[in-house]
Each structure stands twice: as structure tokens, then as C-alpha cells.
């Protein structure tokens, strides 16, 4: 983005903000008022940043002009030069802040999320690690004040999870958790290991935006719904009614099966929630792929087959391979203190997008 178009963009945004302010003051009502109010609120953050940036630019210009005054004494000149240095130091940060606010918004960022964790390579140890990851995200959600609801769970005999999913409700949940998608690897000595050897296992995390019926319309004709008796470990039937539900979205082939609840109705409702999220995410993935192909390069690092993070318990470290960040605080991270990683990943994503402008 060249200087001229950047400046023009800022002027247009400020003009639109003023127009909306006048519109809201004119006594409009109904849907027009609701729409204008939302637009006005959406612009408040960027307008505040633009005003701070413009103020610093104006002060710098004023200080440079004042510096040219021939009648200035030495002390005043030194004071002005210090002010100029401070303003010149602050301008790049303020400009970057404005540019970040101008970046296209991911429409899913404000949504709640569904998180799915599956044990990968490593047998029982992988299932135990999947359970530990699940507890880590549950604790993170608690620290953020988000609502955490288990949707489905497939347990092993000793406390591990073959597969588990949950709904995490709150403001901007997806924007915080979307970079957690991928393969998480653990290196540790299993409790069952008598020789003290370090084992490596893995679990896959998928984070999907939670969508409502208004976002993804599911037509009845596009769904195949099968019901069957729920089964427990070893395949034995655990009840006598067809409470388990399998829903297939025929156009995409995406299937969700749930049997956690005793009620068929509850299993169906949860399955539809997960199905909507998976269809929505598949549509987002296709759009991202199209944009990437248009630029002839892959966008970001959200490939779920990619190893993104390693948790090394003997060394007490957690390493995120996408941003080369290693923290020697594994206990804190496993207990839900993820902000240091999440904030660094968001900053890295913003930097990539800024480089494309």
C-alpha cells in the first residue's frame, strides 16, 4: 500500500465515521438505526487509532516547523529536538497499529468454537496425551471466563481419550484458538515404562468456528440420519433404545456420529452442531485455498497434518515450531496458561498479512 492510498483510506474512514455520527444524531429509527449503530461501533477502534496517528504526525510537523525559528535559545532547541525524536520513534508503531486495524477481518473470529482432539500415533500414551490437551483447553477457557461444554467423548480404560470434542462459548473465542489446529507432539516417560525411556506420541487438534443455523442452512433433503443402539467399550450395547445418531451431509459426505447422551434428541442436536461447524470450516478452507492459488502460494500454516508444537516433559519445555518460540514452563502451559503462545501466533499472522499489503 503506497503512502497516497494509505492516506486516502484513512480520510475515507474518518469521513464515513462522521457521516454515521450525524446519521445517528438525526433521529433515525428501526433497522436503519440498528445497522448504522453497528457500523459506527465497528469503526470506533480504527478511528481512535487513526486519530492518534494523525495527531502524532501533526505534532511532528509542528515541531519541525518550530525548530526553524531563528530566535530559539539552546535549551528550547534541545527540548524540541527531543520531542521530534520521541515522535519519530512513536510513528512507526502507531502506523503499524492502524494498518493492522485495516487488515481484512476473518468473519469467524468473533464466533465461539468447537474443539476436536483425536489421539494419534502412540497408542495408550497418545490417548492420555489427548486427555491432557483437552484438560489444558478446558482450563484456558475457565481462565478466560468462557463456557465449556463437552459434546462427545470416547474414553480408554485408563483415563485417556481416543477422541473428544467440546463447545467453547464466548466473545472472540475462535480468534484466540484457531492457531491451535494441527498435530501436537509429546515427549515423556510413560508411567508404564519401567526402563525410564522417553516415548514420543501425538494428538491432532481441530478448532472450528461454531455456527448457527443462519450461517449454515441444513436442508432436510441433504441429510441422512441413521439411529442405532449406543455401545460401550468392547462393543456391548449399553441401552435398549436407538439413542445413538449418525448424520451424513449428502452433498459433502461429512458424517458425525454421537452416542454420549441417553436421549436421541440430545444426540441429534449435538451432532447437528458439530456438522454445521465442519461444513462451515470446509467452505472456509476451500475459499482460503482459492485465494492461495490465486497468489500462487499457500496461506499461513493451518495444515492440520503439520506438527505445530512439541511438549517435552523431561526438559520442561514447550516449543511452537511455526514461530520458533520455546517456553521452559511446561507446567504452566499444561495448566492452561496459553496466552504467551497465542499472542505470539496472532502477532505472527498479522505480520504475514502486513507483508502482503
Curated annotation (Swiss-Prot):
Which UniProt keywords are given for this protein, alphabetically ordered?
Cytoplasm, Methylation, Protein biosynthesis
Query: Pfam families, from UniProt?
Result: PCRF (PF03462), RF-1 (PF00472)
State the post-translational modifications.
Methylated by PrmC. Methylation increases the termination efficiency of RF1.
UniProt KW Protein biosynthesis keyword = yes
Point to the regions of Basic and acidic residues compositional bias: 283-309
Q: Taking the first listed entry, what is the main subcellular location of this protein, grouped into a coarse class? A: cytoplasm
Region annotated Disordered, chain positions: 283-313
A Gene Ontology cellular component where this protein is annotated is: cytoplasm
Where in or outside the cell it occurs: the entry states:
Cytoplasm
Record carries keyword Kinase: no
List every position bearing N5-methylglutamine. 236
Which molecular-function annotation in GO is an example for this chain? translation release factor activity, codon specific
Q: Which family does it belong to?
A: Belongs to the prokaryotic/mitochondrial release factor family.
Please explain the role this protein plays, according to its UniProt record. Peptide chain release factor 1 directs the termination of translation in response to the peptide chain termination codons UAG and UAA.
Provide the protein name: Peptide chain release factor 1
The species this protein was found in: Rickettsia bellii (strain OSU 85-389)
Gene encoding this polypeptide?
Answer: prfA
Amino acid at each position: 500500500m503506497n503512502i497516497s492510498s494509505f492516506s486516502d483510506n484513512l480520510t475515507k474512514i474518518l469521513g464515513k465515521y462522521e457521516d454515521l455520527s450525524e446519521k445517528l444524531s438525526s433521529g433515525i429509527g428501526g433497522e436503519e438505526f440498528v445497522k448504522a449503530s453497528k457500523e459506527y461501533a465497528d469503526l470506533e477502534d480504527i478511528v481512535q487509532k487513526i486519530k492518534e496517528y494523525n495527531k502524532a504526525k501533526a505534532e511532528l510537523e509542528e515541531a519541525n516547523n518550530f525548530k526553524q525559528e531563528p530566535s530559539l535559545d539552546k535549551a528550547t532547541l534541545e527540548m524540541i529536538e527531543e520531542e521530534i525524536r520521541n515522535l519519530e520513534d512513536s510513528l512507526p508503531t502507531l502506523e503499524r497499529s492502524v494498518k493492522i486495524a485495516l487488515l481484512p477481518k476473518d468473519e469467524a473470529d468473533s464466533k465461539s468454537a468447537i474443539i476436536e482432539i483425536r489421539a494419534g500415533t502412540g497408542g495408550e500414551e497418545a490417548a492420555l496425551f489427548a486427555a491432557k490437551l483437552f484438560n489444558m483447553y478446558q482450563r484456558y477457557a475457565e481462565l478466560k471466563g468462557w463456557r465449556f461444554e463437552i459434546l462427545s467423548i470416547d474414553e480408554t480404560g485408563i483415563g485417556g481419550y481416543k477422541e473428544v470434542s467440546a463447545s467453547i462459548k464466548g466473545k472472540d473465542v475462535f480468534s484466540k484458538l484457531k492457531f491451535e489446529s494441527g498435530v501436537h507432539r509429546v515427549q515423556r516417560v510413560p508411567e508404564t515404562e519401567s526402563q525410564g525411556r522417553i516415548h514420543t506420541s501425538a494428538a491432532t487438534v481441530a478448532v472450528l468456528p461454531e455456527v448457527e443455523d443462519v450461517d449454515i442452512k441444513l436442508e432436510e433433503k441433504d441429510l441422512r440420519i441413521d439411529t442405532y443402539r449406543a455401545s460401550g467399550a468392547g462393543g456391548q450395547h449399553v441401552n435398549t433404545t436407538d439413542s445413538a445418531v449418525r448424520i451424513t451431509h449428502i452433498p459433502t459426505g461429512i458424517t458425525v456420529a454421537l452416542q454420549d447422551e441417553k436421549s436421541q434428541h440430545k444426540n441429534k442436536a449435538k451432532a447437528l452442531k458439530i456438522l454445521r461447524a465442519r461444513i462451515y470450516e470446509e467452505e472456509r478452507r476451500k475459499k482460503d485455498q482459492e485465494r492461495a492459488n490465486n497468489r500462487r502460494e499457500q496461506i499461513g500454516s493451518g495444515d492440520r497434518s503439520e506438527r505445530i508444537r512439541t511438549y517435552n516433559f523431561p526438559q520442561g519445555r514447550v516449543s511452537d515450531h511455526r514461530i520458533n518460540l520455546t517456553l521452559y514452563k511446561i507446567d504452566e502451559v499444561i495448566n492452561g496458561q496459553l496466552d504467551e503462545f497465542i499472542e505470539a501466533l496472532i502477532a505472527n499472522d498479522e505480520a504475514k498479512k502486513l507483508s502482503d499489503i
